[in-house]
Amino acid sequence: MLEKLFHLKENGTTVKTELIAGVTTFITMVYILALNPSILSVSGMDAGSILTATAVASAIACFCMAAFSNMPFALSAGLGLNAYFAYTVCGVMGYPWQVALTAVLVEGIIFIIMSLTSVREAIFNAIPVQLKVAVSVGIGFFIAFIGVQNAHIIVDGATLVSLYSFTSGIANGTFSSQGVGVILCMIGVISIVIMLIKGVKGYMLWGILLTWVLGIICQLLGIYVPNPELGYYSLIPTAFFSMPNSIAPTFFQFDFAFVASHLANFAVVVFAFLFVDVFDTLGTVIGCASKANMLDKDGKLPRIKGVLLADAVGTTVGAILGTSTITTFVESSSGITEGGRTGLTSVTTGILFLVALFLSPLFLTIPSFATAPALIVVGFLMMQQVVNIEWNDITKAFPCFVCITMMGFAYSISEGIAFGFISYTFIHVITGKAKEISLLMYILTGLFILKFFII
């Protein structure tokens, strides 16, 4: 039955491989169930309701991904988009969270229309092959950066980022939590790399679990001491089961009356959500598909329409349930690295999101320094694509360099793509190669430039 549904043999995979990939993807992104309520509740939304809405919307989106495209991508509430929702729309602009949810709903519906009319597919295919490679490499750099941040190997400093100091940690009392977490993360990275070299199946998942277990042992021995003020909690689950929170406080909470009286301002908010959602999704899909060799010889992804439609439907459903924009997660690459090639990986991740509603005390105990090693190693694997960039052709190579570096520097996939597009187009025009740029590329470049003055 599973063979008929997901064409496993045709895609060179097995049920076991897909299940391991789905579990690995889930474990690397389960943090969103803790982080999304923390961010969105700043706007006044009920945290418990947000957690339930996020889990259910994520599961539905993952199931849609499997049904519409048979691809191994997982979806959940997008980071950056939830911060924009809470801190910009509801914070700086001062709009009620019901208005922000309405904007997400409208954005999702527009997204569905764009997907059904092949607009997003045209955008995907308009991106030059070299930039697609750069996007994959840039995402690798980006998620590795997220990994070292999550483990607090890199911390804020006078130079914007700096290395965690064990000496300072011992002096100020943070070593027993933050310092131990850094060491355990490093052990996790080394463990995953060794298992990768040895060809161990499920090395990402085993690396995460090993790091977590070592952390539990350290806590039992008094080496690791929880420090909630720094975000370091007990690694030992206090419970295994809990009943899901009601979504009633956020379900279908829209404010269409406000939209009618503030149409222009509302349109700007919708455009911001739509812009970031479209290009974050495209960037993630390009990066993950490129890593898994899913792109054809022309750099196009078969069944891209289904992938994009699943993302759009997920956003719409998420808004109805009461969460911010649902988008394809870059952590999907961890499952793909484990061999995930079909929608069975997505289904597995989706089921685990539903299970997490009842096992949230267990899943939420896994610390970020245990999942960080997986992100760092996946970043390394994705950056291997850098050899496919034509470095001898500066007109193509420099925009790729800009795209790669700006993803990390701007802490945004879509911003990296924007800088890559703009530099690619301008350099080709100035060097007399304007005819190599498609009309759609010119239009998108113009929109990227306009975006910097609107959002």
Residue ranges and their predicted role:
Residues L2-N36, A57, G78-Y87, G91-I139, ...:
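Helix-loop-helix junctions within the multi-pass membrane cores of secondary transporters/permeases
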Residues L19, I39, I123, G202, ...:
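Residue-level signature of catalytic and energy-coupling elements of molecular machines
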